[in-house]
């Protein structure tokens, strides 16, 4: 599995402390998604919680055994395939199981081998879906940061369309990226708004992407790959292309 240099420096001290305890999540099949995953990759903003996804059913006892600080934390939500806790240092950590929306690029480990983080195309796809569920400036900031990093908006839209069909409609996401109304969107800078409008206006046709049927941490996931991930175009693949079952609705 490839590694990347994480931007741990943007995290609050309490969150950095928790991150150093999360090493066992890799062998348990968890991949980090959400704002903190994007922040670790790009360092563009602070994000104060952790959202871990797994294709496997959630084994809460195994989580508590492998991560003792989770057992000592305050439980905020405990239901099938979902566990959310608040640590003693007030950091929220969530685990979601049976997430079967798939992935289009392989996750990577942080260079300190602490956690596995979803690829930028997959993070963009999930953020584009979130735009249809809520109106929060941080989600638009995340999308703008990933576009600045070179992720193609068309790739993110195509991935989201495959991952979340039929609920996700690319046209609705494009509309959201050009109309900034509601919530706290007044926080967005003029530059961010202009970049989002420009990117949305440039989309003409969605590229072909190959959807793999898990989150990338199944058996053999830690074998070193010889091919680096491509963030702006899809690569030929022999992976399964059928649409996987969707996991539970969530905001990330």
Give the role of each language-model region.
Residues 1-252:
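Compositionally biased terminal segments of proteins
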């Amino acid at each position: 599995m490839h590694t990347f240099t994480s931007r741990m420096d943007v995290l609050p001290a309490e969150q950095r402390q928790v991150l150093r305890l999360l090493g066992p999540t890799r062998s348990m099949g968890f991949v980090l998604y959400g704002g903190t995953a994007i922040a670790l990759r790009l360092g563009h903003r602070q994000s104060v919680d952790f959202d871990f996804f797994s294709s496997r059913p959630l084994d809460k006892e195994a989580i508590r055994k492998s991560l003792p600080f989770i057992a000592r934390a305050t439980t905020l939500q405990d239901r099938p395939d979902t566990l959310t806790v608040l640590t003693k240092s007030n950091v929220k950590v969530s685990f979601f199981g049976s997430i079967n929306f798939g992935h289009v690029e392989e996750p990577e480990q942080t260079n300190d081998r602490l956690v596995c983080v979803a690829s930028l195309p997959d993070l963009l796809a999930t953020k584009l879906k979130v735009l249809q569920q809520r109106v929060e400036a941080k989600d638009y900031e995340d999308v703008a940061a990933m576009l600045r990093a070179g992720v193609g908006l068309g790739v993110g839209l195509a991935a989201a369309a495959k991952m979340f069909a039929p609920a996700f409609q690319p046209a609705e996401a494009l509309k959201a990226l050009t109309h900034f109304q509601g919530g706290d969107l007044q926080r967005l800078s003029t530059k961010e708004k202009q970049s989002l409008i420009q990117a949305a206006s440039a989309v003409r046709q969605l590229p072909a992407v190959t959807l793999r049927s898990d989150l990338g941490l199944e058996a053999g996931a830690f074998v070193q790959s010889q091919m680096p991930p491509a963030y702006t175009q899809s690569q030929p693949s022999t992976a399964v292309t059928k649409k996987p079952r969707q996991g539970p609705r969530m905001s990330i």
